[in-house]
């Protein structure tokens, strides 16, 4: 099953990884670490809450005005 991952640099270093389909969030020192941790956290989540029960969210984008 292919799922989404959103990785954001953490202010204190490393990366925060988020899976929008399940809401699982974790972190890691490198992109690879963060993705591996997210994979493990998401697998554990899906054992209890399969996507067939939870459903998939609608991912879209929106715009906000830029401020100087």
Residue ranges and their predicted role:
Residues 4-21:
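Short aromatic-glycine-(Arg/Gly/Cys) micro-motifs in beta-strand/loop hairpins
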Residues 8, 25-27, 39, 43:
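A ubiquitous, low-specificity "background" feature that marks scattered single residues
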């Amino acid at each position: 099953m292919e799922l989404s991952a959103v990785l954001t640099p953490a202010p204190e270093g490393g990366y925060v990884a988020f899976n929008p389909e399940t809401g699982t969030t974790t972190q890691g020192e490198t992109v690879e670490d963060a993705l591996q941790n997210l994979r493990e956290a998401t697998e554990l989540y899906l054992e209890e809450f399969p996507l067939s029960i939870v459903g998939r969210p609608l991912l879209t984008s929106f715009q906000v005005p830029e401020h100087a």
